[in-house]
Amino acid sequence: MTRQTTSQTCLICGDSADSLHFGALSCRACAAFFRRKVAGRRNIFRRCDRQCKVDTGMRKLCASCRYDKCLKVGMRESAVLSRLAKKNQNYKKSIVGSPDAYEPSTSTSDSVLENLQSAYHKLEETRKRVFNISETHVSQCCNYKRMNDVFFEDIKLVMEHLLETFKKSDISQEQEKLLCVHFMVPFILFEGGYKSTNSDLFYLPSGDFIDENRIEEYYSNPDDQNDNSAKSAAEVFRPYWKLNKQTLKTHLDDVQLDLPEFLFITALIYFDDGLLDQNEECIEVCKQMKAKIIEELTDYEKNVRINEDHSYRVGQIIMVLHGIQRTMNMIHETKEISLVYNVYDMHSSIFGNMAE
């Protein structure tokens, strides 16, 4: 006698469901979406009136409504967090090998990841306060003026909260400044891409966004009633927006980084050992730090991806750095073109903080 199978439907998007995930019947795509959002502790910025339709065709368009529906049908954040806690405990055991390592400590940790997680959490909390981000915050589509204001303010926050974590006594202030200059813009672009995963929007630290399908709005100036420059600028730079999506954002969509992986890459961006005017002492420290970061990353992947090929995952993550470098090459070209067309000010927060 053959058992007749009945098709099951994902309670979130209506696609075919394979089993219960985190307490609700869902497809793998919605389960992975929910896990990423909870595990990554990402702020889900709302840009709608909570009435978006969530189905197989529209599920990627509004993360906030999709997340709300996950919770509504019974998915539990605690189910994700408990699983992560077990993996994180295995990770700490493999590094330290002592139960005492789980206890909070007032001393500075030797772990790159733990120090970065603490610093990034403080950065995110400060951003909420500075940019007035609350649970009821509704994201707004912004133009170049708003973007420049946000990034000029946020760069100061990044320097205060994140870069302090990277400082090493073996590196002079002059060399620290060199590393900082080469870090800032790649980090801005990388973090924006990370927070905009699976979206056609580019999210800013303020929660506002740039709609990459309507870049005329980004280049528009509401103070100028006869603003013809917006269309001209959009025509000039549209190919570069598309190229950025192909080189970095699409790559990040494929890799689907979690928060620790994002932070490991952030550290690798900073400790670059191939910069012009970098002295031998700085190069040596950067090489040592890169080796330590890769070692921690490898240990992390071994313990989080127990039944998967962790070495392949490490390779995927390292390749993200190549995508960031290609994007930076494109940004340098964009800067030159902006000077020719006299639209440098439309990207001044980016161009003004780039290394020459």
From Swiss-Prot:
Chain ranges passing through the membrane: none
One GO cellular component term: nucleus
Start-end of DNA-binding region: 7-82
GO biological process: regulation of transcription by RNA polymerase II
SMART domains: HOLI, ZnF_C4
Molecular function terms from GO: DNA-binding transcription factor activity; sequence-specific DNA binding; zinc ion binding
Matching Pfam families: Hormone_recep, zf-C4
Subcellular location, record wording: Nucleus
Keywords: DNA-binding, Metal-binding, Nucleus, Receptor, Transcription, Transcription regulation, Zinc, Zinc-finger
Zinc finger (NR C4-type): 10-30, 48-70
Superkingdom of origin: Eukaryota
Domain NR LBD residues, every copy: 108-356
InterPro entries: NHR-like_dom_sf, Nucl_hrmn_rcpt_lig-bd, Znf_hrmn_rcpt, Znf_NHR/GATA
Protein task: Orphan nuclear receptor.
PANTHER family noted in UniProt: NUCLEAR HORMONE RECEPTOR FAMILY MEMBER NHR-42, NUCLEAR HORMONE RECEPTOR FAMILY MEMBER NHR-86-RELATED
Protein family: Belongs to the nuclear hormone receptor family.
Name of the protein in question: Nuclear hormone receptor family member nhr-42
Originating organism: Caenorhabditis elegans
Originating gene: nhr-42
